[in-house]
From Swiss-Prot:
Homodimer. This is NADPH-dependent 7-cyano-7-deazaguanine reductase. It comes from Paraburkholderia phymatum (strain DSM 17167 / CIP 108236 / LMG 21445 / STM815). The lineage of its organism: Bacteria, Pseudomonadati, Pseudomonadota, Betaproteobacteria, Burkholderiales. The active site is at residues 181, 188. Its main location: cytoplasm. GO terms for biological process: queuosine biosynthetic process; tRNA modification. NADPH binds at residues 82-83, 249-250. Keywords: Cytoplasm, NADP, Oxidoreductase, Queuosine biosynthesis. One of its GO terms (molecular function) is preQ1 synthase activity.
Length: 274
């Protein structure tokens, strides 16, 4: 299935009765073909989805709520189109379930089937909301730099690194990431963290490169994977991890993480803009 066939950008009817058929899978291969990623992935990682608008009825008809966090493996054959995900979660609103465990197991089964891979899921009931505090990316902020920018489509040639000097290890981040939905054209606002070991990357060049996504159209996952590929190709780090946190739309935020070395999966930190 393609993004153009999805509910994204089209009028939709909202059902409040549970319906697993609302989930619309999109093959990762289509977007990866566009940026030159073949069957052997140059990274591993996960997409962290947070859903803030989940509610259902208990066996006595009383509404229940929870925040859901999903971990979708980067090697899953499919992602789920975000509007269909919203419609699917909304279909729980007037459906009765015996317990939160049944809700979790139902969602995990359906989303795993749509993605074609086992998806991890945690539901946070209100008693656990205090665990979900605000945090910001660790590292050195690139946004401190006072510079000119004039390129607003991704251009890997902007990147620079000290290829002839001793390797360094750095963690850098920017809150100036912006791209646009390829179907609706709506802006996607985000923050991105880059952790690497290798030739030192020119900070100003990296910030200009991040800014260059401003008029780019691409899904969140594809943008992060393109950043990963471009930094690997031009800057030649030995180790690289790219982690983006996008602001929510339709009660969902999507946060892709890609790395080529053995790191634990990142914390699901919630930034101030999320």
């Amino acid at each position: 299935m393609t993004p153009e066939q999805s509910p994204l950008g089209k009028p939709s009817s909202y059902t409040e009765q549970y319906d697993a058929s609302l989930l619309f899978p999109i093959a990762r291969k289509n977007a990866r073909d566009q940026i030159g990623i073949g069957a052997t992935l140059p990274f591993f990682g996960t997409d962290i989805w947070n859903a803030y608008e989940l509610s259902w009825l208990n066996a006595r008809g009383k509404p229940q709520i929870a925040i859901a966090t999903f971990y979708v493996p980067a090697d899953s054959p499919n992602i789920v189109e975000s509007k269909s995900f919203k419609l699917y979660l909304g279909s729980f609103a007037q459906s009765s379930f015996d317990s939160i465990d049944v809700v979790r197991d139902t969602i995990k089964r359906d989303v795993s089937a749509a993605c074609g891979s086992s998806v991890s899921l945690h539901l946070y009931p209100p008693a656990e909301f205090s665990k979900l505090g605000l945090e910001e990316f660790e590292g050195t902020s690139l946004d401190r730099l006072d510079l000119d920018a004039e390129v607003y489509q991704p251009d890997a040639s902007i990147l620079k690194a000290a290829l002839d000097e001793a390797p360094v290890e750095e963690t850098l981040f920017s809150n100036l990431l912006k791209s646009n939905c390829p179907v609706t054209g709506q802006p996607d606002w985000g923050s991105v963290q880059i952790h690497y070991v290798g030739p030192q990357i020119d900070h100003a060049a990296l910030l200009r490169y991040i800014i260059s996504y401003r008029n780019h159209t691409g899904f969140h996952e594809q943008c992060v994977e393109k950043i990963f590929l471009d930094v690997m190709k031009v800057c030649q780090p030995v180790k690289l991890a790219v982690y983006a946190r996008y602001t929510r739309r339709g009660g969902l935020d999507i946060n892709p993480f890609r790395t080529n070395f053995n790191l634990p999966m990142p914390d699901n930190l919630r930034t101030a803009r999320q």
